[in-house]
Amino acid sequence: AEHRIVPLYGLEIIALLPELQSAGVRINDPGNPGKLYICGKGITAFDPLSSRAGELLEEIRRKDSERMRRMLERMADLAAAAGIQVRLTEQDVKERIARRHGCPVEAVYLQERHLAQAYQEEIFARYKEADRAVALERFLGGPPASALDDAVGLQNEIRSRLMKAGKPAFVPETFVGFEHARALILAMGGIPCYPTLADGAAPICEFETPPEDLIGRIKDWNIHMVEFIPIRNEPDVLERYAVAMRRAGLVITAGTEHNTLDLLPLEPQCLRGQPVPECVKELFWEGACVVAAHQARRREGQSGFVDAEGEPNSDFPDAEARISAFAEMGARVIRNTVEQPLN
């Protein structure tokens, strides 16, 4: 608040729906049938965690941590076989991240991109500029496609060429189910939110087309908020999906893909830098205000946009009244924060 910024806290969980996996139905991961990304918006109950949230989160962390340890072992073996004397441990990578972000080592949980970044940085630290291309070629099993001054591109190559399915450092993921993921979001005080890929996949995932059927499936899950990452979408497709969803009583939010070191704009853009349609911008702003209001009210012990079971706030006669009221409350929260004097 002292910097006049309203942080909206959230999390993302990967779940697996075996019945859709068996049927070959892609949900919102274009390469993996049955794999579901689900988000939680307006998280409030994370410090301290409730015992229920702690149990649900620990199961996910335990599975992830074991997978990362096994991948690090395979990465080290690949490096050794290539004659590259880099062997990073789980603790090594965690300490790097903790130093970078100024956080306790105990707060760090590794993901694939952390491992790829650590190996790229360590190879560059150990090899002179003239020798880096050869070292990377040995490590990757072929010349890098990215320029040597493109650190993020090289990290992405390490990940895609060594760590993905069918690659030498790959370790299969283990996932929780949908109900586990939804329960964790609610136990942390959040709003379950469906990330919509739409034309971010080609062809569009079976679960997500046509938009009217997707809306019905989201509502069947008792989810009342969706998210778009518009940098993946053509403006007309984004507008078609977002407007239909909002008319159906779903809150619309936006993400900006800031999950790597790529220097992307903070303001949402569509594919190839095209502007987000004005009507969708308004929906994104409305959604941000709803999340801000939910977060502020839950923090003060009041009812949020959804309750602890994920049911919509019953103080309002319908979705339109609920969304409008929370958007208005959230706009006040944001305005009161950004207009206060800087310390």
Please identify what each model-predicted range represents:
Residues 56-249, 333-334:
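Domain-core and long-helix interface of multi-subunit machines
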Residues 25, 36-40, 47, 134, ...:
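Hydrophobic transmembrane signal anchors and adjacent membrane-proximal interface regions, especially
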Residues 71-79, 146-152, 221, 252-267, ...:
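Short flexible/disordered coil segments
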Residues 1-104, 227-283, 287:
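A metal-dependent hydrolase metal-coordination microenvironment
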Residues 272-343:
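Extended, intrinsically disordered, low-complexity segments
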Residues 114, 224-227, 259-270, 326-342:
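Repeat-unit-sized solenoid/scaffold elements
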